[in-house]
């Protein structure tokens, strides 16, 4: 039993640990984040020991009182750490002995290893972060995108491919596109949650529990869906961390592209949007500058999260079966990933909820050449094969350019009919941006009805 000078594993050692090795080995500076999960796991585990007859009712009550006292200290930031507190498990067990006495506290770890203890803590911690932090923050982001899309449904803007103006779309269609990405992230996170919510507790160091503890009882008490059926896998599996961090990298890839679009849209060259002061910074030299640092950081921090994942994968890839100390390197990148993702969600929500849209600039950026596909579709409706109409429309664009005209709508009917005799007076009805977007009314399109349908569908998926 640790008393602040002894280690949990110190019985077979006679020499002192090198001071640098102690610091190198210690994880309490970061794994303290799991204090609540560690205490919760110990509370249920000791109930399992009592069920086996290894603890009396009185001992269990005393242990639970002590655990509650420790949680109060952590919650109030009054827990006193000792130099030899190697990790959160050591610290909590040491403190429990101080509160209720070492004799009773010394029974808490009966049949349990830190190998199954730490991964139990990790799974509880990840589950709580997903449920209490990531789900609400991500839903909040999608809700803001949907609300904005509904309120600004009538604003038109250029849609881009290759960062070149392509076809007119609704601003709400762009908003809906990222609401769709983030809703898929939301659903994907739910699938990961189902897989990570399995209990390793009771697997021991690697070979199983020596006293036949009821692992299903432990799992139920901790809110897990099931137990992991192989004790070797139970203590060594970190796939749930890899999956969660991969999810974080995928979300950050989406948020990075989202940020890049908005960075472009808020430049003076585009002027489609203006960020609020709350999410902008200035220059230390140039007084006129208003920089989109919030968006640039969203883009930049995506690389940080990618690095968290790849770094841990490199630590994990070559280790032998069951537990190895390399696995201690799972926590810092995991915690960093989860915190960065959460903060990115909140920043993105703040940005999109407070920015100002310049409707006039968006609509002024629409040009008639963006209706060249509509011109091709005009002939398709007259029975001309699309491949032929595509060529004809391209010839119309080239003719207007060669004549120095500002757009294909400036060609006369006579000039159109020189290119193809099937053009008629009604072709000029094609040159209307509102009608262009309204023709895209199939599911997923940019017509008002299609966008509203997308938004309603997204709401139902989140609910």
Curated annotation (Swiss-Prot):
GO CC list: cytosol
Residues bound to 2-(N(omega)-L-arginino)succinate: 27, 115, 161, 291, 323, 328, 331
Primary enzyme class: lyase
Catalytic machinery residues: 162 (proton acceptor), 283 (proton donor)
Pathway noted in the entry: Amino-acid biosynthesis; L-arginine biosynthesis; L-arginine from L-ornithine and carbamoyl phosphate: step 3/3
Alphabetical keyword list: Amino-acid biosynthesis, Arginine biosynthesis, Lyase
Family to which the UniProt record says this protein belongs: Belongs to the lyase 1 family. Argininosuccinate lyase subfamily.
UniProt protein name: Argininosuccinate lyase
Naturally occurring in which organism (per UniProt): Saccharomyces paradoxus (Yeast)
């Amino acid at each position: 039993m640790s008393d602040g000078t002894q280690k949990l594993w110190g019985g077979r050692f006679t020499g002192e640990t090198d001071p640098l090795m102690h610091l190198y080995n210690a994880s309490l500076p970061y794994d303290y984040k799991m204090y609540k999960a560690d205490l919760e796991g110990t509370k249920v585990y000791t109930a399992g020991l009592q069920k086996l007859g290894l603890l009396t009712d009185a001992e269990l009550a005393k242990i639970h009182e002590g655990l509650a006292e420790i949680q109060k200290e952590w919650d109030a930031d009054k827990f006193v750490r000792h130099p030899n507190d190697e990790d959160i498990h050591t610290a909590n067990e040491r403190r429990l002995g101080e509160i209720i006495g070492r004799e009773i506290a010394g029974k808490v770890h009966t049949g349990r290893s830190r190998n199954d203890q730490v991964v139990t803590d990790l799974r509880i911690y990840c589950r709580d972060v997903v449920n209490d932090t990531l789900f609400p923050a991500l839903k909040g982001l999608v809700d803001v995108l949907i609300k904005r899309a509904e309120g600004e449904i009538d604003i038109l803007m250029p849609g881009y491919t290759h960062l070149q103006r392509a076809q007119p779309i609704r601003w709400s269609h762009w908003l809906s596109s990222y609401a769709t990405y983030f809703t898929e992230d939301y659903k994907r996170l739910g699938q990961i949650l189902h897989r990570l919510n399995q209990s390793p507790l009771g697997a021991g160091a690697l070979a199983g529990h020596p006293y036949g503890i009821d692992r299903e009882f432990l799992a139920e008490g901790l809110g897990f869906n099931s137990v992991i059926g192989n004790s070797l896998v139970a203590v060594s599996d970190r796939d749930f961390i890899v999956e969660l961090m991969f999810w974080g990298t995928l979300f950050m890839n989406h948020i990075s592209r989202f940020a890049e679009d908005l960075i472009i849209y808020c430049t003076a060259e585009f002027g489609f949007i203006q960020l609020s002061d709350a999410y902008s910074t200035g220059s230390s030299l140039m007084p006129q500058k208003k920089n989109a640092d919030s968006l640039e950081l969203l883009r930049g921090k995506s690389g940080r999260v990618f690095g968290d994942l790849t770094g841990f994968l490199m630590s994990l890839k070559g280790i032998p079966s069951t537990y190895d100390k390399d696995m201690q390197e799972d926590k810092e990148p995991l915690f960093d990933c989860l915190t960065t993702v959460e903060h990115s969600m909140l920043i993105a929500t703040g940005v999109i909820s407070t920015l100002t849209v310049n409707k006039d600039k968006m609509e002024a950026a629409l040009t008639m050449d963006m209706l060249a596909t509509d011109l091709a579709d005009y002939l398709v409706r007259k029975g001309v094969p699309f491949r032929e109409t595509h060529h004809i429309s391209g010839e119309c664009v080239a003719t207007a350019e060669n004549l120095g005209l500002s757009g294909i709508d400036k060609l006369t009917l006579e000039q159109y009919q020189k290119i193809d005799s099937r053009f008629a007076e009604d072709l000029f009805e094609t040159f209307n941006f509102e009608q262009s977007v309204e023709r895209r009314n199939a599911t997923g399109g940019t017509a008002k009805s299609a966008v509203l349908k997308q938004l309603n569908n997204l709401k139902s998926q989140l609910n």
